[in-house]
């Protein structure tokens, strides 16, 4: 499981208000620009916990820890109703991490292709800069991997123009 902070899990409400359970005004602003999900008028993310799950999901993915990445996206996904852009994004990224896991850890490219096809369906219509993640690159790489799985070797997710990698201190956000 992945947590957004050292105290509460992603599914826990903030201040006991279920309607505000994805809001966290303490989450840092974007690394660059004003991506979809950032509200410049309030100076906060629309869903702070989604931003944190995305940051940690990207870091673990880029460290080659696809199962941990999957868990970060999946745990946050449960916070959103089906039919929302947030749900589609998170479900798609769960599939991306699972597909990379199939390819890298199991050399199962048929499984990877199946998961990436599903990921592309979920990510269709999600803005290219959703919560700072470069989804145009994600979609392009998933399509290319269908014919040439080796494009995944060394590929890293980019958020705010950077490709951050999990450090030892990031492990505090993973719980059993």
Name what the model sees in each region.
Residues 1-176:
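Acidic, polar-rich N-terminal leader regions of halophilic archaeal proteins
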């Amino acid at each position: 499981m992945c947590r957004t902070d050292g105290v509460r899990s992603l599914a826990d409400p903030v201040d006991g208000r279920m309607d505000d359970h994805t809001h966290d005004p303490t989450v840092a602003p974007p690394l660059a620009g004003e991506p979809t999900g950032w509200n410049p008028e309030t100076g906060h993310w629309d869903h702070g916990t989604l931003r944190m799950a995305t940051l940690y999901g990207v870091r673990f993915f880029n460290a080659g820890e696809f199962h941990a990445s999957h868990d970060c996206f999946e745990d946050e996904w449960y916070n959103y109703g089906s039919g929302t852009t947030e749900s589609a994004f998170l479900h798609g990224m769960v599939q991306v991490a699972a597909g990379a896991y199939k390819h890298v850890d199991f050399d199962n490219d048929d499984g990877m292709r199946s998961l990436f096809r599903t990921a592309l369906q979920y990510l269709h219509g999600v803005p290219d800069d959703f919560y700072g993640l470069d989804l145009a690159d994600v979609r392009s790489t998933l399509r290319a991997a269908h014919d040439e799985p080796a494009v995944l070797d060394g590929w890293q997710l980019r958020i705010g123009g950077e490709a951050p990698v999990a450090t030892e201190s990031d492990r505090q956000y993973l719980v059993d």
